[in-house]
Amino acid sequence: DTGINLLDPGKKPHENTKFLLFLAAVIKAVDENAELLRLSASNPGNDHRLGANEAPPAIISIFLGEQLEDIIEQIVRGDLSSSIHGTKLDTGVHVLPVLRKDATDRNRTSPFAFTGNKFEFRMLGSSMSIAGVNFILNTMVADVLNQFADELEKADDFDAAVNELIKKTVTEHQRVIFNGDGYSDEWVAEAEKRGLPNVKSFVEAIPYLVTD
């Protein structure tokens, strides 16, 4: 395998423009296609499961972790300059080594979470095929990357254009980023305030198959 993981932030994510561009593409794709993602994980059994029984909620949001959320905030403010790094976890047991704590942490209440160097889509039921989800995920991200390519290929100053594109994209789509408790009633109210869809069943999701 000689490929490059485009979602690997590296040691200094704030300096990794390639990673930030692909991160922005995923954020935009998820925000613009949340209803289709919800549809891809929908059947009567899974509709009942979502939001309970250790399953993520039906509202689509992205968990980035403290490090990447801080970087997104810096980008939006226009002062990107640093990356938060993981702290050490001291168990208090002297015979055990001090453990490195992941800077992205974990949030099991998130339906779409960044975990180190990849995203996890966690809504799909165990009995469901991953084919539909993969088709939707790959298509929606490819569509956004195609839009990015069209814009960047005609840029006179590529570096300036890509930085501006990243800032514009995450600013417009940061509403879908949520690092808190996806099970809470407060999140349902906050998601509605942000304009995020709350598609509660397969029947409600069907009309989105024919929307633009």
Predicted regions and their residues:
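Acidic, glycine-enriched catalytic cores built around paired aspartates
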Residues: 29-212
